[in-house]
Amino acid sequence: MARIKDKYRNEVAPAMMEKFGYKSVMQIPRLEKIIINMGLGQAKENQKELEIAVKELGIIAGQKPITTKAKKSVANFKVREGMAVGAKTTLRGEKMYEFADRLINIALPRVRDFRGVNPNSFDGRGNYALGVKEQLIFPEIEYDKVDKVRGMDIILVTTANSDEESRELLRLLGMPFTK
């Protein structure tokens, strides 16, 4: 079992139950899924770029990502409908907890000049969005084999009803928020 899942069951859930006064164990917010998205503007000219990004995202997530396609044609960006413009993957279950553990305990502390993540990046429905500027913070990516630095969006979707509940859940799981 993932360390973070174990921590959730033994420490986080009882603390949340006490703080918010839930009547049922099922009311306690939990991680539902983690979505990792890589938007690649350069992919329209260079198909190899997309293949490399998909491969790297697969290594980071531990499962094969899908390529995202443009919904509309935009002349200013030279994008036509149906062109591949990025890659994304959705993690659930054990893989989600494993990834959350690696993100919080290994990847985020490796970010240059890291002082914590923004505590205001909640969407109003209890979900947290986080932008990463480079894929090198993940230990699975070998520095020598990287041709280009790519960023990604990581969205942590929770079952929380409010940002306050979600913030407390992530804080108890070990997410390093800035003060």
UniProtKB/Swiss-Prot annotation:
<keyword id="KW-0689">Ribosomal protein</keyword>
<dbReference type="InterPro" id="IPR020929">
    <property type="entry name" value="Ribosomal_uL5_CS"/>
</dbReference>
<dbReference type="GO" id="GO:0006412">
    <property type="term" value="P:translation"/>
</dbReference>
<dbReference type="GO" id="GO:1990904">
    <property type="term" value="C:ribonucleoprotein complex"/>
</dbReference>
<dbReference type="GO" id="GO:0005840">
    <property type="term" value="C:ribosome"/>
</dbReference>
<keyword id="KW-0687">Ribonucleoprotein</keyword>
<dbReference type="InterPro" id="IPR031310">
    <property type="entry name" value="Ribosomal_uL5_N"/>
</dbReference>
<dbReference type="Pfam" id="PF00281">
    <property type="entry name" value="Ribosomal_L5"/>
</dbReference>
<dbReference type="InterPro" id="IPR022803">
    <property type="entry name" value="Ribosomal_uL5_dom_sf"/>
</dbReference>
<dbReference type="GO" id="GO:0003735">
    <property type="term" value="F:structural constituent of ribosome"/>
</dbReference>
<protein>
    <recommendedName>
        <fullName>Large ribosomal subunit protein uL5</fullName>
    </recommendedName>
</protein>
<dbReference type="InterPro" id="IPR031309">
    <property type="entry name" value="Ribosomal_uL5_C"/>
</dbReference>
<dbReference type="InterPro" id="IPR020930">
    <property type="entry name" value="Ribosomal_uL5_bac-type"/>
</dbReference>
<comment type="subunit">
    <text>Part of the 50S ribosomal subunit; part of the 5S rRNA/L5/L18/L25 subcomplex. Contacts the 5S rRNA and the P site tRNA. Forms a bridge to the 30S subunit in the 70S ribosome.</text>
</comment>
<keyword id="KW-0699">rRNA-binding</keyword>
<comment type="similarity">
    <text>Belongs to the universal ribosomal protein uL5 family.</text>
</comment>
<keyword id="KW-0694">RNA-binding</keyword>
<keyword id="KW-0820">tRNA-binding</keyword>
<dbReference type="InterPro" id="IPR002132">
    <property type="entry name" value="Ribosomal_uL5"/>
</dbReference>
<dbReference type="GO" id="GO:0019843">
    <property type="term" value="F:rRNA binding"/>
</dbReference>
<dbReference type="GO" id="GO:0000049">
    <property type="term" value="F:tRNA binding"/>
</dbReference>
<comment type="function">
    <text>This is one of the proteins that bind and probably mediate the attachment of the 5S RNA into the large ribosomal subunit, where it forms part of the central protuberance. In the 70S ribosome it contacts protein S13 of the 30S subunit (bridge B1b), connecting the 2 subunits; this bridge is implicated in subunit movement. Contacts the P site tRNA; the 5S rRNA and some of its associated proteins might help stabilize positioning of ribosome-bound tRNAs.</text>
</comment>
<dbReference type="Pfam" id="PF00673">
    <property type="entry name" value="Ribosomal_L5_C"/>
</dbReference>
